[in-house]
Amino acid sequence: MSMESATHAVRARLLDFTGLGYRVAFEIGDEGSITIDASGTTPEIVEDAGGDEDADCVIKLSMENFEKLIAGTLNPTLAYTLGKLKIEGSTGVALKLAAMLDD
C-alpha cells in the first residue's frame, strides 16, 4: 500500500474519529506519517506531517500493520501487546482510538 492509498483508507473512515477530541499521528515505517486532527468538530487529515510534534499520541507501525489496523483485521490492543505497534504520548488517547477502530 502506498502513502496515497493509506491516506485514502483513513479518509474513508474519517467520520469514525468524530468525537475523539485529540490529534493522533500514525508514523508508518519509513514511508511517512498521517495525522488525524480530531480536536475540532470535524476530523481532518494531514499527510506526512513529519511525525507531528503537536500530536497527543503517536502510533508507530509498519505499512502492513497499518493497512490491517484501518481495515479492522488487526486488534490494536493485541498488536500493542505483541509489539506490532508502539505508542508515544497518551496511552489513553490510543485506547480511545482503538475503541473507535473496533466499531
What are these regions (language model features)?
Residues 1-103:
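Feature captures hydrophobic
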